[in-house]
Amino acid sequence: MLLVEFDAGDIEAIADAVVKRVATAYPLSRAAEIAFDPVRQSALWRVRRSLFPTIIQRPGPRKAWGFVEDPIVPRDRVPEFMEFLVDLARRHGTVAGIYGHIGDGNTHYRPFFDPTDPQDFERMQALREEFDRALLERFQGAPSGEHGIGRIRAETLPRVWGAEVYGVMRRIKEALDPRGLLNPGVMFSPDPWWTSWGGLESRVPM
């Protein structure tokens, strides 16, 4: 599902041109719709906003864990990146929920795993390593376009900025917070991503 919203210019003409171009270029699963009625527009946006709740409530032991959920890539690489994400999940024995903000190149990617299953946990780690490598090297992207580095992406930060810039960032943090009292482990941590969850006993996705 792709929602495109216009707020300037000859909106009717622009929308018609976009629909024709998309319908010509891609095999659509259903006919494209142009909605001018505010009630219909609101209904379509409700579908978009329901994606995340729907994904995380999927039944079964495998849940949509958010450990690779906020990548951003150059906009002209988005189609290739989407294909990569679908294939990445498949090659690691699962499927994934994918949604996001395509105009920004920002994707929310949530593969389904059960981290309390040792084999699934190994798959999660392998997927994360391949994801990080491809995102940074092949797609020239970054691990977070919206949600921030936090704890879950902290170990990837040195690979994003390089040792020199990362070192400067750490020294600034240490100068302002020498005792490490402010948000310990956030952004600057060598620990594996999964330790930030404080254990993997919970089956509730994050």
Model-derived segments and their meaning:
Residues M1-G145, G150-M206:
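Noncatalytic alpha-helical scaffold of FAD-dependent oxidoreductases
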